[in-house]
Amino acid sequence: LILGIPQIVIGLTVVALGTSSPELLVSLNSVFKGSDSLAASNVVGSNIFNILVVLGISSLITPLKVKSRIVRRDVPLLIAISCSVWAMSSTGILTWQAGIFLLFCLLINTIWEINTINEKDDDIKTAEPEINDFSLSNNLVGTITKLVFGIILLSFGANILVSGSQDLARTLGIKETIIGLTIVATGTSLPELVTSIVAAFKGKTDLAIGNVIGSNLLNQLLILGSCSLSSGLGGLSINIDLIRTDIPIMVLTTFACMPIFWTKGKITRFEGFILLNIYILYVLDKILILSKFNFIIEFRFFIIAYFLLIFTSMFLKKSTRLIKK
């Protein structure tokens, strides 16, 4: 903000990169330890958690006003990337070529964000530079110092989390994919949750939303791209359950942002409550899988019907209001 950069751009880039660091280190650590399923499920689970829980809780604190930049550009881009990841991983392998493509898209998107920092929008105004008692150089030194220590601590934490997750999966006889989608994803998404909650309390809704959208982009472009390259010529193995169930859910939750963001221009408390409900149903689905109940298919049909009913009714209701206006 000192440089007069809009909050939404900071959220989509700098803050998103910082909050996605745990996912990056944990997923890379998982690949190096031969646990591709943990690496991929961490990314997918984090993206689902970010949209349903982080946006849900943040909007319960205060309705999140959505800038038109998010609607017309960033969310469609996130949808396109999510669909591309689903398509490229449909064979069960995210190849190293796919990794190069994802990292190239990250480069293009970063250049795009930098070149449009001062873009004029109908509801975006560049933040005024704030006066700070310290010099910019002192701030920079302090920031770099914190960054170095943070990376060191994250590296140790990532190693412990991956080892602990693998041990837990072996002890309980649970697939690493489920551990990655739930426990690991929740743990690595805590920075996004805390950042967006603090931003919501301070009324910086741009930062709260931009952090989530930016983190979800980085999770797929940077983390999956890096992991697939780190896996060598064989590529990153993608569990069949992720391809059939969890990646489609990730794509659907991303699509769900459009009717919420596009109409009325904000995420209301009620919509945040619905997002949290959907995540609870998602976790219940995983619990039913572990318990091996026979009605898992019926429960999933209920989730899909609930999901479609809620968001279709919300979309139609808000669209009707816009037409009347």
Language model segments and positions:
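Hydrophobic alpha-helical segments, chiefly the membrane-spanning helices
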Residues: L1-K325
